[in-house]
Amino acid sequence: MILNAKITSADIFIEDHGVLTFMIGIETSAGWSTNIGGFYLDWTDKEGNRVPAPYTSTVVRAILETVGVRGWSDLVGKYIRIDDNDIYNSPITKIANLMKDNWINIRDFMEE
């Protein structure tokens, strides 16, 4: 189902186990709240160093451009459209600008 949603939080952070990730909190027009994200933005190389995943800058930029903002902190308070995949408890990966038909599937960037 396609729903409108307000972005309530937007964070890029290092999880407890050392992985760089992002989380975007939303409140939907259906009355429920959830988070979008949790994908790895980095991993460990052969030498044991944390290095950016090849898609990191691409996915961050795609999210910013889709929502229509220039900075990650500017996401908060913006409205988007989401596709909940019509599956209960399925992660939200498809977002679009509220006024434009420019959908992205965040998961697609992770599979490149």
Where on the chain are the PLM-derived regions?
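Short beta-rich binding modules
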Residues: 1-112
